């Protein structure tokens, strides 16, 4: 039996080291077991460009992180070329160890006090009109990092008065009321929190999270800020059924959520949860129709859709696939 990993503060643990700490064990996927990607999942990546390098340089210069890089998003090149990025605050080390996610796990360092100011300056320099701010889970902080989100919102608006801000927040486990109080005076323009999957799969996919808690977070924020749209996203291909997804959509609507993203899950490595099924584009189209019938004002559904993929277009109600 191998010895448990002794985590050092500030050290990133990935792949096998990260997965070794999960209560529900996921065996490494053998190459012969990996599902082959269908034709609709094969895309030609845009060539590296000066725009991509400029965004990466701005991130490095100010010690900022993007979830695009940390989570190995397949849309990175397209979004960076488009001049958009999803900034990840509160460091690049998560206190959770979800087996679908490529963000590193470990004991994070204290929040950087100057990060909101540096983030706001970088965004102003990039002349962005719409920005998405997300974070790792910070179960080590009393408010789960909510005040840091609020500070970032305030500083960004101070330097870019006409910008729209979308926050993709963690679940603030055990700290919901404290977190919502911290966000009260500086809320975003769109409040996003992902349910990720059907409740039956939570123990395997989101260990440490609770389906009803996440729904309640979305509902309570909406009750406090009725003019701010709430948004959530799900991954497809983890073993869920279509019927389960439809039930989740109904739950989201019952809790006031009006914006939705549905995308195909892609395994970051053989140590992560394997892809159980590649969902055809036609099925995404069908789920979009169902979502709109249920009352969602906008639903971005497609194999390559991610929570923040063309989030500016999503917020305008434009077609995103």
Curated annotation (Swiss-Prot):
SMART domains assigned: Elp3
Gene Ontology cellular component annotations, sorted alphabetically: cytoplasm
Residues engaged in binding [4Fe-4S] cluster 2: 94, 98, 101
Pathway entry: Protein modification; protein lipoylation via endogenous pathway; protein N(6)-(lipoyl)lysine from octanoyl-[acyl-carrier-protein]: step 2/2
Residues that hold [4Fe-4S] cluster 1 according to the record: 68, 73, 79, 308
Essential cofactor(s): [4Fe-4S] cluster
Pfam families to which the protein is assigned, alphabetical: LIAS_N, Radical_SAM
SUPFAM superfamilies: Radical SAM enzymes
Keywords: 4Fe-4S, Cytoplasm, Iron, Iron-sulfur, Metal-binding, S-adenosyl-L-methionine, Transferase
Coarse class of the protein's main subcellular location: cytoplasm
UniProt cross-references to Gene3D superfamilies, sorted A to Z: Aldolase class I (3.20.20.70)
Catalytic activity field: [[Fe-S] cluster scaffold protein carrying a second [4Fe-4S](2+) cluster] + N(6)-octanoyl-L-lysyl-[protein] + 2 oxidized [2Fe-2S]-[ferredoxin] + 2 S-adenosyl-L-methionine + 4 H(+) = [[Fe-S] cluster scaffold protein] + N(6)-[(R)-dihydrolipoyl]-L-lysyl-[protein] + 4 Fe(3+) + 2 hydrogen sulfide + 2 5'-deoxyadenosine + 2 L-methionine + 2 reduced [2Fe-2S]-[ferredoxin]
Cysteines joined through disulfide linkages: none
Cofactor note: Binds 2 [4Fe-4S] clusters per subunit. One cluster is coordinated with 3 cysteines and an exchangeable S-adenosyl-L-methionine.
Broad EC category: transferase
Domain Radical SAM core intervals: 80-297
UniProt xrefs under InterPro entries: Aldolase_TIM, Elp3/MiaA/NifB-like_rSAM, LIAS_N, Lipoyl_synth, rSAM
Subcellular location, record wording: Cytoplasm
EC number(s) reported in the record: 2.8.1.8
Family under the similarity heading: Belongs to the radical SAM superfamily. Lipoyl synthase family.
Protein name: Lipoyl synthase
Source organism: Vibrio vulnificus (strain YJ016)
Gene responsible for this protein: lipA
């Amino acid at each position: 039996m191998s010895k448990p990993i002794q985590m050092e503060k500030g050290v990133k643990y990935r792949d096998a080291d990260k997965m070794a700490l999960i209560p529900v064990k996921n065996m490494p996927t053998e190459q012969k077991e990996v599902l082959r990607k269908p034709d609709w999942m094969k895309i030609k990546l845009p060539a590296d460009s000066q725009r991509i390098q400029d965004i990466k340089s701005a991130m490095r210069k100010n010690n900022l992180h993007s979830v695009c890089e940390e989570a190995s998003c397949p849309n990175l090149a397209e979004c960076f070329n488009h001049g958009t990025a999803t900034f990840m605050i509160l460091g690049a080390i998560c206190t959770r160890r979800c087996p679908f996610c490529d963000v590193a796990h470990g004991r994070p360092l204290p929040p950087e006090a100057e990060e909101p100011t540096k983030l706001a300056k970088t965004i102003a320099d990039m002349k962005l009109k719409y920005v998405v701010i997300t974070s790792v889970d910070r179960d080590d902080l009393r408010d789960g990092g909510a005040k840091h989100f609020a500070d970032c919102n305030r500083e960004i608006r101070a330097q870019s008065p006409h910008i729209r801000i979308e926050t993709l927040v963690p679940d603030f486990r055990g700290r919901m009321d404290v977190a919502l109080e911290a966000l009260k005076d500086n809320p975003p323009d769109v409040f996003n929190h992902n349910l990720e999957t059907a409740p039956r799969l939570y123990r395997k996919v989101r260990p440490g999270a609770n389906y009803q808690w996440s729904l309640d977070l979305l509902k309570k924020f909406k009750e406090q800020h009725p003019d701010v749209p709430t948004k959530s996203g799900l991954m497809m291909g983890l073993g869920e059924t279509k019927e389960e997804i439809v039930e989740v959509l109904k739950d989201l609507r019952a809790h006031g959520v009006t914006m939705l993203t549905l995308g195909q899950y892609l395994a970051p490595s053989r140590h992560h949860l394997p892809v159980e099924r590649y969902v055809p584009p036609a099925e995404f189209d069908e789920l979009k129709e169902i979502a709109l019938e249920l009352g969602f004002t906008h639903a971005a559904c497609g194999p390559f859709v991610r929570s923040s993929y063309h989030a500016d277009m999503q917020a305008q109600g434009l077609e995103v696939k």
